Amino acid sequence: MTHRFVAAGSIARYHSLYRKKLGAMLSMDIALPRNEQEWFEKLPPELNDKFEMKLYYGHLFCHVLHQNYILKKGVDEKRVKRELLNFYEDKGAEYPAEHNVGHEYHAKKPLSDFYKDLDPTNSFNHGIGRTSKLKHWRE
């Protein structure tokens, strides 16, 4: 467990030390399908060429990988993130794997429906999973 935190801290520190030479840093939690045998991605060259550095670390026996990417200077962070998420979706992976969707990711329909059942008035955590922020889930 400690190694995971050391790895995460080291890439973040590297990025902060060399931020003038580097692009943005992306951090992803990805749950691979249980039958996945290729744990380390093989990205298409046109996507792979956008990274200065990649670091992977994970959990034993559960197929959850934490993947940190440092982009090359000038690369569009939002576009690359979307390309990565599309790549993961095509592999059948789930994201985020460990820390729920928060306000950053779209909740898939079953999860969105679950939130609506738990909170019919949308009073407790409106906007979670990029759902409606309006009372009673109005759009």
Task: Name the predicted role of every residue range.
Residues 1-139:
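Conserved glycine-rich FAD pyrophosphate-binding loop
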